[in-house]
Structures are given as C-alpha cells and as structure tokens.
C-alpha cells in the first residue's frame, strides 16, 4: 500500500493491537486462562436487567425506532436531557444538554481530543501531559504525531501487607507552554489507582493556571459504572473534560462513550463526529436513558456491579498471596477498575519475557512496558518489573492462573 504519513503512523503494531490480538488468539484456544483482556464481566443479574429493558423498548417500538434512525451528531437528545438532569440532581453541577456529547466509545473520543488540543499549530508543537504513569494502554498510539505524549513518573508509597500505591509527584510536575492537555484516568487502568479529591483539585488548579483543559477518563468511575472502592467525589467544571463509557457498565458492544465539557468543546466535538462518522450509535443511550428514568441505574451500579468487582479483587489478592508467599511480590492497592497491578522486585528477567513464558504455560496477562506512555526515553526498570492481570474470571481460573504465575516466578527468583 502507498500510504500517506497519516497512514504510515497507524500501520505499525501498537500495544493496543497486540493486546487485542492476544485476546482473540486466547479465545480461540481452549484451556487458556484469560487474565489479559479488558472485557467486563458477564454478571447474570446485570444482564437480566439489560434484557428486561430491551424487552420494554421492543414492546414500545422504541428499539426499532432507535435502530432505524440517525441521531444528531451530538447524540440522542432525550438521553442528553436525562443525563444533564441526572448530574444536576446528583452533584449540583451547572450543566445542560449542550455540555454533553456521545461518541463511539471513549477510545474515539481520546483520538479526537488528544489530537485537537495537542500537536502542531502555528509552527510550535504541544503535547498531552500524563501526570502519573502507569496509565491506560489505549493512550499510547492515538497521536497523529508520534511524540504527542509526555508523562511524569509516579511517586511510590509503600503500604502495609505488601501493598503499594502510586501518587502524583507534584514536586517534579512541570506544566509549561509545550503542554496542550493534561489527562488522567480515575480509577486507573492498569493499576487500579484512584486519584484523591485533593489530587484532582490540585491538577485542576495547575491546568487552569496553564490555560489547558484537564481530561478525566472516568471509564470505570463514579457515578457509573462505579467500579471504584474508595469514597470519592465526581469532578467537573468548565475547564474539565470528563469522558465516561457504557462499556464497563456491561455494554461494550454498544460502543457508547460520553463526553462532558464546556459548550465550545461540545460544539467542536459534535462537528468532528459529523465529519468522521455522521452520528454516534443510539442503542446504548436508549438503554441507559431508560435505566435512569426508571431509577434503576444507581442501584445496578451500587448493589450489583461494584460489589461484584470488589469481591473479585479481594479474591484475586487472596489467591495470589496463597500461591506466592514472597515479600518481593508487591500488589498495587486495588482501589477500582478490574485489574491487579503486580510489581516483582529482583525478578532477574523482564516481565516482557515473563509474559512469553506465561503465555506458553497457558496464562495470558499483559506486561508492564505498554502502560508507560511518554516514557520511551526514561528508565524502564520499573515498567519491566510489573504486569497487569484481569480479575473478572471465575475463582477456578483465577486460582489456576495464580498457580501458573507462582511456578514461573519460582524459576526466576
């Protein structure tokens, strides 16, 4: 193919492509323990609620209407109205439908937002600053400019019982005119880290002083799907862009993301949607609109989704500790999302090599090096000592995965 510079940029083999290929390969091989992907758990009680809503939408004719009509580029207007009212009532935000847009999943939103606020303009180049790594693998390759991202290594805090936690290193965080956007996730994929309210407020002050937006990726966060195990307050203001998703609610196939921002950003974003994809999908919006109107959404998250993931996180930690009784295993405190982040001190090999050994033994995880965007020129020793594992699988699979990991670690330690 004779590709343009744009085409060449996305013709490589990225970390997110590697992850999705391994997921597909693992699904095709019976017996492989799949602790590498990011697919949400299939929770029967949650699926039953979705089925009930779809039955109601089908009976009323709304399902066929949704599937047979385009929505506006900004998204389904009835859902935007419902969401705005929901956020006003729940959190007192000064927000209306003109502050919200829908998109084909959060990933497409990141592509638009990263390349709109950062990149080349007027002879200079601005970058997306990630103030704490490790961070989401999906940020790494969305830039049209390959040098779009820069990042700050986290401050590591050791906790009791073999846990540790990442915190923003504000003392060394520098924001100058080369930064066009600051981006964080809350909770963080891969580590399960949750930024405190005070950390969010301090990042907001820094972003406001630098006159750049603060983007908060809340794909796992509050108020929905609320896969977050710490008491936190949702954060938004006119200088903040919040990205949410219906995927981790249990609807990844609906490909629906939510962008909350000031009206100028939403107008621009909607224009980009019209140009690139005409309009966002409407099915996920219709389902969640009905859940909110019937006052089912928050109980679904608080009483079913969050307890499920918290119990699985606790179980996964317990199984790991039982299989690997070694103080050189450090586990990031699981505060949210659906992953455990493991740090192996003095391993002797990189977790990239460990990943290959585990793969041959029938266990799929993700090596840590993919989660450090903007750190390509930095010391990779910590990145290569960590890996991510998904804990949504059954107790039997988690236990078998822990045993395989323990066996391979014994050969390294």
Language-model region placement:
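PLP-dependent enzyme catalytic core of the Aspartate aminotransferase-like
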Residues: 2, 81, 85, 89, ...
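N-terminal small-domain helix-loop-helix segment of the aminotransferase-like
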Residues: 9-105, 154, 161-172, 299, ...
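Short, solvent-exposed loop/turn segments at secondary-structure junctions
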Residues: 38-42, 107-108, 135-138, 187-190, ...
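Conserved core of the PLP fold type I
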Residues: 65-210, 215-236, 241
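Active-site PLP attachment segment
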Residues: 231-271, 279-283, 398-401
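Structural signature of PLP-dependent enzymes
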Residues: 270-276, 294-318, 347
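Conserved glycine-rich beta-strand-loop-beta hairpin in the small C-terminal domain of fold type I
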Residues: 305-317, 329-344, 382
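Conserved C-terminal alpha-helix-loop-beta "cap" of PLP-dependent enzymes
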Residues: 328, 339-387, 400
